[in-house]
Amino acid sequence: MKYDSVAELVNEAEKRGLKLSELVLKSQAQIAERTEAEMFAQMARSLEVMKESVQEGMDRDKRSASGLTGGDAFKMNEALMGGKTIAGPFFGKAMVKAIAVAQTNACMGRIVASPTAGSCGILPSALLTLQEERNIPDKDLVMALFTASAIGIVIATNASVAGAAGGCQAECGAASAMAAAAMVELCGGTPKQCEHACAIALKNILGLVCDPVAGLVEIPCIKRNAGGVGNALVAAELALAGVESHIPADEVIVAMKKVGDMMSPTLKETAEAGLATTPTGKKLCEKVFG
């Protein structure tokens, strides 16, 4: 089975009466010439790393090697525990986890690139928060990761998941789309609703540039992970409510590629424009590198 079209994956799943995750697990086992149990176990290890990366990123005092970032997940969690959040506990918890994982990455900890290190907090925060709120068993989260991976493969095949190729829309956009589709399946949505969630998430972030201060995956990347999980939640909520994307997911992916191709190289991970070249951005760069 090819992974070059979200619509084809959805059609195949519907034809066979399977969830996207079930279809992908069977397909990947066949491609890898391994059993489904072996593929499941491998994905389960990724889930464990995701959980560990959340805990590691909650450290109040741990700072990145550059000294630019650290402690924000702790601050956000304190606000959440104190009932000071605006958007409610679910989104608050998701933000905490997204920032925590991204901080773990900035501190050279172990994360799951999902699909990249720069966007590593979005998928885990979405799924682990949903698990916490709805008491979902690990096995269901592992299966949802197969759904997410399929969306990621299609995006990587037809566009890119790299900031250097397509800007942050490719990194945080892909992660948001993956998370949105996975959440929809976990909440009982259909494969078609997963497709709509993917499309909506990508549309919401189309055109976002990659402009890391000092060329490091910290500013604004860590906070963009919090924004990315928010985007995924919006897309999943809309899709589960029956809201459909007028533009199919596959066409949105192609549009994202075209937008990325039109972006100046200065806006694609080179730290030569955007926030990286603001007066404060330059000062922070000098602080790190002298």
Residues covered by each model-derived region:
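Acidic-glycine-rich active-site phosphate/pyrophosphate-binding loop
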Residues: G88-N105, D140-A159, N204-P212, I247, ...
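Functionally critical mobile loop/hinge segments
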Residues: E185-G290
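Glycine/serine-rich anion-binding loops at beta->alpha junctions
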Residues: Q103-L128, Q169-A174
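Generic N-terminal targeting/processing segments that precede catalytic cores or assembly contacts
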Residues: M1-G109, E133, G242, A249-G290
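Glycine- and small hydrophobic-enriched segments that form the cores of compact globular domains
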Residues: I86, A113-C120, E132, I136-P137, ...
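Alpha-helical support elements that line or immediately flank enzyme active sites
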Residues: P124-N135, A180-G188
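A structural-propensity feature for long, helix-poor, extended segments
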Residues: F146-M178, A182, N204-N231
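Conserved active-site and cofactor/substrate-binding residues in soluble primary-metabolism enzymes
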Residues: A37-V49, P89-V96, A106, G121, ...
